[in-house]
UniProtKB/Swiss-Prot annotation:
It comes from Bacillus subtilis (strain 168). InterPro entries: Na-dicarboxylate_symporter, Na:dicarbo_symporter_sf. The lineage of its organism: Bacteria, Bacillati, Bacillota, Bacilli, Bacillales. The gene is tcyP. Pfam families: SDF. This is L-cystine uptake protein TcyP. It comes from the Bacteria.
């Protein structure tokens, strides 16, 4: 009987996927299809949970089958992350028109990303203190304890090395190993390797322009192919979101989620506040935030539902281009934003965790010196955070271990991790685009006509 029910559930999922496919054939917008998938997944997941319970064999077996679509989609995103990061950084150098501004452009982008991460940390701290979040308020179940032990082990592996040794670890001793994502710092290592190749290209361009042009054509060709692969994966987003949301809701412990509801509310209050700050920064830079919102919605929706900053990179770059950002700057901002200064995952989240855990170690969370220390540590630790699932955890481990706090307590939030990760990812992408826009405005490279052309709104299929 159980097998028949599992088959029935898989058949229902197949019918829902078929419905989404029909919507695509009717040219329903990408954003609408993704939100439809999100809604269907939530309803279907709740139905399975209410009928059978999250721990029943039927739900567990059904979730296992659903994971072929959901987990497969995530694997495909992970597959393309390193090639995407590498070729985007390298492509940014080959597409850069004014090499004399290279230092200023890259410095501005990185500076804005890190500065906004520091602001995001302050917002996260304010939110945690306002909502009086404390780790001792949360009960530890077996899942939370298991997750805590896993994080503790990861932290011990990281803290076994001194700070100078950890800095050296950022460098790509073997770039081919880092292309496999084997190390926690693989993403930033690939960025550094690509940047070295890019700088070398600029040098060759002056001395041997013919060879540089050949290399540029090769990079442009690989860039086009990688972007095409990513576009094919992006088109699977509604189906992946449907399967992921159904599985997540069906297997979630609703009691734990309700108990942690205050943390979810506080997190989204901080995320929304930081997003408003992005809009204010654009306004102060002389850019219309309403136009930004209209053009940014598709990529922010994709980031929210996919929970992958890296997967959103092509759409991120195309969206910046539609707002008049030059191709080179758009590539730099999008690519650097994957591993440096993620406002959500590396800013708000670790800062809120630090405030929650502080009272458990006898630290007064309202101490100004402690607050400044947390902001500084968060900003510095924001280098090297990966743009695919797990980046926030890595950032939290770095921050908490640097502050000598028990990292195991971060495992308390495992039940709501997917829920808050959606908002964090959208904020990461917004921060990346904001840095590109402001940099373009400051360097006077922005195309104002393209920015104000509200007919240029990019959907995922166009990425």
């Amino acid at each position: 009987m159980e097998t028949l029910l599992v088959v029935l559930h898989v058949f229902i999922l197949f019918l829902l996927i078929l419905g989404l496919f029909v919507m695509q054939k009717k040219h329903v917008s990408f954003s609408k299809r993704v939100f439809t998938a999100l809604g269907l997944g939530i309803v279907f997941g709740f139905a399975l949970q209410l009928i059978y319970g999250p721990t029943s064999n039927i739900v567990i077996q059904t979730a296992d089958w659903f994971n072929i679509a959901g987990g497969g989609y995530v694997k495909l995103l992970q597959m393309v992350v390193m090639p995407l990061v590498f070729i985007s950084i390298l492509g940014a150098f080959t597409k850069l028109k004014l090499t004399k501004n290279l230092g200023k452009i890259s410095g501005l982008i990185i500076g804005i990303l890190v500065a906004t991460t520091a602001v995001a940390a302050a917002v996260g701290i304010a939110s945690a203190l306002s909502f009086d979040l404390q780790a001792i308020q949360v009960d530890q179940g077996s899942t939370e304890l298991s997750r805590g032990q896993e994080l503790q082990q990861k932290s011990e592996d990281m803290t076994a090395k001194t700070l100078p040794q950890q800095i050296v670890e950022l460098l790509p001793g073997n770039p081919f190993l880092d292309f496999t994502g084997a190390r926690p710092t693989s993403t930033i290592a690939v960025v550094i390797f690509a940047a070295f190749l890019g700088v070398a290209f600029l040098g060759v361009k002056h001395k041997q322009p013919e060879q540089a042009e050949t290399f540029k054509k090769l990079v442009d060709a690989v860039y086009a192919i990688v972007m095409r692969v990513v576009t094919l994966i992006l088109r699977l987003t509604p189906y992946g979101v449907l399967a992921i949301m159904t599985k997540t809701i069906a297997t979630s412990d609703l009691d734990s989620i309700l108990k942690l509801g205050m943390f979810v509310i506080a997190s989204y209050a901080a995320l929304i506040t930081m997003f408003i700050i992005h809009l204010l920064l654009l306004t102060f830079s002389g850019l219309n935030p309403v136009i930004y919102l209209k053009k940014a919605v598709p990529v922010l929706v994709f980031a929210f539902t996919s929970r992958s900053s890296a997967g959103a990179l092509p759409l991120n770059i195309k969206t910046q281009r539609s707002m008049g950002v030059p191709e080179g700057i758009a590539n730099f901002a999008g690519s650097f934003g994957l591993s440096i200064g993620q406002n959500g995952c590396a800013g708000i989240y670790p800062a809120m965790l630090a405030m929650m855990i502080a009272p458990t170690v006898g630290q007064n969370p309202f101490d100004p010196v402690f607050i400044i220390t947390v902001i500084a540590v968060v900003a510095i630790s924001s280098f090297g955070v990966a743009g695919v699932g797990g980046g926030a955890t890595f950032a939290a481990l770095l921050v908490l271990s640097s502050l000598n706090m028990p990292v195991a307590l971060a495992g308390l939030l495992i039940s709501i991790e997917p829920l808050i990760d959606m908002g964090r990812t959208a904020l990461n992408v917004s921060g990346s685009m904001t840095s590109g826009l402001i940099t373009s405005k400051v360097t006077k490279e922005i195309d104002q006509g393209a920015f104000h052309d509200q007919s240029r709104v990019i959907e995922a299929e166009e990425a």
